């Protein structure tokens, strides 16, 4: 369970958009609308170095990376001098993009319309954080695995599921949701409660999902 929590914490930090951490940024005096996701990543690197990132980066140790300035464009980058590996804005975007694809995460690019809306968003997010702090979090993966193993469309047992990668497991979840939704719509058509003409091309094809 600790390993799972640690993994998802690292994924959350690597894929975070400023709006995702507007409360934390506000607490240290940073307006979340004035920075981008790479700026946020650079702010979070110190915290990431304290985490076990091996499940994401394997043997690439973030502790060895130090901030440096790219002399060609003046941008701040992270450099591991022992290996010569550089993490810049483009590399971070690739890492975050890959993790979002694996976990089906959407980039949240929302910006408040004005200062009043921004304060309202921050206050709502702050209240939500307080509620979550008082709630004991169940294992996200465990709940999904138990649900799927007891679903007829899922053809793996508990042991078989352990052999799947995170990406394969998440794809299975989405595919099964799509198949169940398709079956329900087809039953609705035959029962006369769903109109076939109201269905889109995507609704008719359960083999793909977006």
Regions found by a protein language model. Give the residues of each.
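An amphipathic, hydrophobic-aromatic interaction surface with interspersed Lys/Arg
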Residues: 1-35, 93-188
